Curated annotation (Swiss-Prot):
SUPFAM superfamilies: MurCD N-terminal domain (SSF51984), MurD-like peptide ligases, catalytic domain (SSF53623), MurD-like peptide ligases, peptide-binding domain (SSF53244)
Protein name (Swiss-Prot/TrEMBL): UDP-N-acetylmuramoylalanine--D-glutamate ligase
Main location: cytoplasm
HAMAP family in alphabetical order: MurD
The gene coding this protein: murD
Amino acid sequence: MSQKIVILGSGESGVGAALLSKAKGYDTFVSDSSMITEAFIAELQQAGIAFEQGVHSEEKILSAQLIVKSPGIPEKAPIMKLIRSKAIEVISEIEFAYRHIHPGAKFIAITGSNGKTTTTLLTHHILAQLGYSVGLGGNIGTSLARQIIHEKKDVYVLELSSFQLDDMYTFKADVAVLLNITPDHLDRYEYKFENYTASKFRIFQNLTPADYYITYSEDSVIESYKKDHPVDARYVPVSLKQLYSAGAYSDEKTIQIHALDDTVVTCNTEEFPLQGKHNYINIMAALNAAVSIGADIHKSIASIKSFRNAPHRLEFVGSIYGVKFVNDSKATNVDSVWYALDSMKTPVVLIVGGVDKGNDYSQIEALVKEKVHTVVALGKDNSKVLSGFASMVSEIKEAHSMVEAIRIAHDSAKKGDTVLLSPACASFDLFKNYEDRGTQFRNLVIELAG
């Protein structure tokens, strides 16, 4: 009798896990308390996988020997409390896929509160340009479980969220990257920053002295936590202050990086499509990761020039009468806005707001005072933004739709200014998600420019 596996959640990771489970011959059942999309229903039916939607049937779920949980389901969900009370093993889709991975596959795993998507995409781009057989997965693109059913890659570059890391146990990366840790998603961690930090550090679990780990060496949270939780692997630092005996350093004009033969290679940052200190950190991390699995440093550097970042991340949309419009809708916390403002070279009209996560806007006060002359508060309830920025800028205005926000921002901007959408907040008060918010911004700007 085959092992019974229940998949909780029917997004890309859940359906991918279900398809892999079925392919491996397990008794597979999918349960989602929400409605499953038509496309995913068709896939499940074609594969002969039983499922339910709009409900969690306790009897069916609690009869499982193994549960693969989608990352969006919190531990406080009633069904999870029941599962935990029965001591049924719960793992993530990544962990499930890892347990069925083909021998010899290597993993580059990347996490961080900010920058992980860009760094993951860039690392994948470098290796693909250099001819590696490389897959992209995790919190981005196609689920790892789906990928390994029919296709075997030599290397997988994975973006991993804290939610995914929480349910990973035997997974081991060959190269593990932790970019930074700033407060985020604390509602999932009992509002304790130390719990969130511990979750991020799971990226280093099971590393051996033959493996590599990469961090931004000036991140005080990472450095402090490392003192009590040392990592047993080869350290490859990324720094904006100095060049260590390994890793990479940027003075913002250049990047210096150790090659495999330990020679130091220097390149000019002006050659890269990604600009700003935060992006130099991302570039150095990606280069270090590629070099750590054997990539040629010179070819890796050259490949970056053809990279195009994912949408909604400091995406230049266009100019209207000399005013630049930049879409940074993915900036859903204060730290992301700090990085965005730090990269700005012109005076800024800042569109900010949405569903506040308990933000402390004083963290960006110095940069706002230096670079921003007008704030446009965009949201249903703008009270926290209005009070948070009132003492920082000469002008602060309210908008309750993207159309209104762009009109106000454009009217407030002078030739040579930049209108920056970098909200620092979640989007679901006025928009479906951050992509919807960014897409509306982009489309309206293009329409105005036309």
